[in-house]
Amino acid sequence: EITKFPKDQQNLIGQG
């Protein structure tokens, strides 16, 4: 899980 942005981590999975 990419947790660069805890705010929208589930939305940014694969984008980070």
From Swiss-Prot:
Signal peptide: none annotated. Optimum pH is 8.0-9.0. The keyword Membrane does not apply. GO terms for molecular function: D-glucose binding; manganese ion binding. Keywords: Lectin, Manganese. The keyword Oxidoreductase does not apply. One of its GO terms (biological process) is cell-cell adhesion. Requires manganese but not calcium ions for cell-agglutinating activity. Belongs to the leguminous lectin family. Monomer. Glucose-specific lectin. This is Lectin. The lineage of its organism: Eukaryota, Viridiplantae, Streptophyta, Embryophyta, Tracheophyta.
